[in-house]
């Protein structure tokens, strides 16, 4: 049995691979058509102009769905492992809410480009990155609370390092972007897709975009740490029938149907 066939480990793997492919495919398309510069554009800039905008939107929406699925499985796993720990239960619920909000922001980024509705696009990006960062932080606290009985110390330290990486990237991005957009670097700096080294604010732009890419890769690394955990969990779906027909009838007891969530049982 391959490693990705064990439990639900394919979920975080698919999330990372699919999201990375989204960024790479839209980047290659935008570069090939000369819609952006090769040197570190904003991630969303590679999905601003058709046809890469269509590709970016569709693929990023699917990534958001994969993200919610991954976070929900993580929520169910932590809940099953700690059914009576009040602190862990509260943190686990908070983590799920933060994760869903982050995925909502990701979907907003996918569907509202900065060239059309800039405010909505920025709100989506802030939601995705900020809630995603807090989600990582909460999950790291959960890892600390559950080690060494359930989680190994190594997993906690790896996740802590990834959270620190994410925090440094976020701080760099916020600082440089605030200076870039609040200073007098021209009226089109917000919508600008092509930058030259002699342009005002070029260095700030590069640092901001580099921090954005760096932050995204810290997310990738964090979700990859879920693979080993997800090898030890499966989910099932249960159909409860209220009658023997689909007409309006008096409810009668019938046998419930139970099948694996994905039509096969990974053991």
UniProtKB/Swiss-Prot annotation:
Does the keyword Membrane feature in the UniProt annotation? yes
Where in the cell is the protein located? Answer: Lysosome membrane; Photoreceptor inner segment; Apical cell membrane
Tissues expressing the protein: Expressed in the retina.
GO cellular component, alphabetical, reads: apical plasma membrane; Golgi apparatus; lysosomal membrane; lysosome; photoreceptor inner segment
- Major localization class: membrane
Q: Look up keyword Magnesium and say if it applies.
A: no
Annotated transmembrane regions: 8-28, 53-73, 87-107, 118-138, 160-180, 203-223
Topology relative to the membrane, per the entry? Answer: Multi-pass membrane protein
| InterPro entries according to UniProt | DRAM/TMEM150_Autophagy_Mod, Frag1/DRAM/Sfk1
Q: Which UniProt keywords apply?
A: Apoptosis, Autophagy, Cell membrane, Lysosome, Membrane, Transmembrane, Transmembrane helix
* Top-rank taxon: Eukaryota
What does the record list as GO biological process?
A: apoptotic process; autophagy; cell population proliferation; phloem or xylem histogenesis; photoreceptor cell maintenance; regulation of autophagy; retina development in camera-type eye; visual perception
Function noted in UniProt:
Plays a role in the initiation of autophagy. In the retina, might be involved in the process of photoreceptor cells renewal and recycling to preserve visual function. Induces apoptotic cell death when coexpressed with DRAM1.
Q: Which family does it belong to?
A: Belongs to the DRAM/TMEM150 family.
User: This chain belongs to which protein, by name?
Assistant: DNA damage-regulated autophagy modulator protein 2
In its UniProt entry, the species of origin is given as: Mus musculus (Mouse)
Gene name of this polypeptide: Dram2
């Amino acid at each position: 049995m391959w490693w990705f066939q064990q439990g639900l480990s394919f979920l975080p793997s698919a999330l990372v691979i699919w999201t990375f492919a989204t960024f790479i495919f839209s980047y290659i398309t935008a570069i090939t058509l000369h819609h952006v510069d090769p040197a570190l554009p904003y991630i969303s800039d590679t999905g601003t102009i058709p046809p890469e905008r269509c590709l970016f939107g569709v693929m990023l929406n699917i990534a958001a769905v994969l993200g919610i699925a991954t976070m929900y499985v993580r929520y169910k796993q932590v809940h099953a492992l700690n059914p009576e720990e009040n602190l862990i239960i509260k943190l686990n619920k908070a983590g799920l809410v933060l994760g869903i909000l982050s995925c909502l922001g990701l979907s907003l980024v996918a569907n509202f480009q900065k060239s059309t509705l800039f405010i909505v696009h920025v709100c989506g990006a802030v939601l995705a990155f900020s809630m995603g960062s807090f989600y990582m932080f909460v999950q790291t606290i959960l890892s600390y609370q559950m080690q060494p009985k359930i989680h190994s110390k190594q997993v906690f330290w790896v996740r802590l390092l990834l959270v620190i990486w994410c925090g440094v990237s976020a701080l760099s991005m916020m600082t440089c972007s605030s200076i870039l957009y609040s200073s007098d670097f021209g009226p089109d700096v917000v919508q600008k897709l092509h930058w030259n080294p002699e342009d005002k604010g070029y260095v700030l732009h590069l640092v901001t975009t580099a921090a954005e890419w760096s932050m995204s890769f810290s997310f990738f690394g964090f979700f990859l740490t879920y693979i080993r955990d997800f090898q030890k969990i499966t989910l099932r779906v249960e159909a409860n029938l209220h009658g023997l027909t689909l007409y309006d009838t008096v409810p009668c007891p019938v046998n419930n149907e139970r099948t694996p969530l994905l039509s096969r049982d990974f053991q």
